[in-house]
Amino acid sequence: MLNAYKHSGKAELKPVISKIIAEIPEIRRHVREVIDIVRETINEVNQLPIEKQKEIIEKNWPELLEEKPRTEEKSLPPLPNAAKGRVVTRFAPNPDYTIHLGNARPALLSYWYAEMYEGKMILRFEDTDPRTKAPFPEAYDRIRNDLKWLGIKWNEEYIQSLRLPILYNALRELIKHGGAYVDKCSPKEFKKLRDSGKPCPHRELPPEKHLEELDRIFEGYYSEGEAVVRVKTDLSHPDPSVRDWVAARIIDTSKTPHPIVGDKYILWPTYNLAAAIDDHLMGVTHILRAKEHVSNTIKQKFLYDHMGWKYPETIHFGRLSLEGVILSKSRMRKMIVEYNMEPYDDPRFGTLSGLRRRGIVRETLWRIIKDVGINVIDARISYVNLAAINRSIIDPQAKRYMAIEEALPLKLIGFNNSIEAHVLRHPSTRETYNYIIKPGDIVYISQKDFNIIQNKMFRLMGIGNFALTRPVFSKNYIGFEARLISLSAKEAKQYRAPIIQWVKLEQSIRVKLIIPKETNLETRILLAEKALTNEELGNIVQFYRIGFARIDSKEPEEIKCIFAHE
């Protein structure tokens, strides 16, 4: 009634059905049967004058005519000290793996803020550790592709391993300013001095001496562990890790070559040196990163003070995790070896490619990350909540298909002429897939459905109302006869008849449904409508009374789908 009144007295089926499903989600499973009733009701309402429609609404539901305030999408808070056209953000992943949900947060926030202030965003690969966090050659492109899938467009791109000469020049300047020195103490000796707040004996040598030692490092005079470059900080700082932190170390790249520059370099900047210098040289104005980097911010500010630079505005936010999926890089690597898992897009992983493969769309991640924003409190998202958001986004587009498991044959009797069955592909459209059901045809239902239709009327979706009569023993199958009672959807509703999905064997396709469960993958074998073969790879569909799934691969005799959620 309200839909008709708001649209010049004429209601439309599509928005009415969508509204019903939104308010009564459980009706989704029976929408094929409800749609005829809704269509009849709409025809009755549309025959009323618009004045009569308003009168009925005012009498029965006056609150529906009240104007409600519009709720706006949650927006990001402003950045401190930000001006239009002058904001420069950066997303700086380590290409030792691909991006997961937690990484997507700084990536999207950096992009959104750059857009908000009409500034620019930099993508910078921080790959200056060829040993402990060795880059994966394929990770660079995978990260680029993941960012593109998220809808992120960056203005500039840098790879730090290709910028080592630039970083070396900055390191020389830092030494000249008295802000760094070459330390030749053993790690054990330095730790003892650091813990007691005492300086290394090399610390107060003149910058010229340290520049000479730096040249000796470049010439290969020192081996791994014999010398490091340190930044001078506060030796009484309460956090011992801040005290004269390591800025660069020697790594024997003949043993662990870098995937891009090979064994060309032996002195490698640490994260804090490379990030701090590049943030300044690239003009970064705002850094958005997790609060685990607070100590890194403290360390880097010492370097900035030595050089007389202004440190960027830094926003630290809490960690973002997702229940039921694996986000830890180290755990992923371990499982790849132990369980022979796929490296990046295994659907058990919380990587963007893993989530995408199981049917999570980017709009879902947008909404989650915009909701948590830059809050400093850790956010743990349940998969149930993620699924609810994802469902609200994919439900309006995902086509529906019947699918059964543990097939049980029914021989349909009780009618003389063929029945044209209409299986709805989506409740908001008139698109259907039509079947011709002839007397004596065999359809297959799930064994679990058979257990609930004994001794009662049931409705075969899109066909009509039936009742079981007797077992059938054939040389080809053992099943049951089902006699047609009526075609009426209203009668099915009146008697609360269970609605049963079915397939015809000659018009079906085998479906392997993969269901991620923590560290396991469960498999269900279905028989689905053969029309499913018309869907493209990557499409998300809904199997009636099973849930949403993404088409992962297609073969002539089988389609593999990854289960997303109900």
UniProtKB/Swiss-Prot annotation:
Q: What GO terms are given for molecular function?
A: ATP binding; glutamate-tRNA ligase activity
What does this gene product do?
Catalyzes the attachment of glutamate to tRNA(Glu) in a two-step reaction: glutamate is first activated by ATP to form Glu-AMP and then transferred to the acceptor end of tRNA(Glu).
Give the intrachain disulfide bonds. none
- Report the family membership: Belongs to the class-I aminoacyl-tRNA synthetase family. Glutamate--tRNA ligase type 2 subfamily.
Against Pfam families, the record matches this protein to: tRNA-synt_1c, tRNA-synt_1c_C, tRNA-synt_1c_C2
Cellular compartments annotated: Cytoplasm
EC main group: ligase
Annotated Gene Ontology cellular components are:
cytosol
Sorted alphabetically, the keyword list is:
Aminoacyl-tRNA synthetase, ATP-binding, Cytoplasm, Ligase, Nucleotide-binding, Protein biosynthesis
Q: Which reaction does it catalyse?
A: tRNA(Glu) + L-glutamate + ATP = L-glutamyl-tRNA(Glu) + AMP + diphosphate
Give the EC number. 6.1.1.17
Show where the record puts the motif 'HIGH' region.
93-103
Q: What is this protein called?
A: Glutamate--tRNA ligase
Question: Which gene specifies this protein's sequence?
Answer: gltX
Origin species, per record, is: Staphylothermus marinus (strain ATCC 43588 / DSM 3639 / JCM 9404 / F1)
**What is the first-listed, main subcellular location in coarse terms?**
cytoplasm
Q: Does the keyword Ligase apply?
A: yes
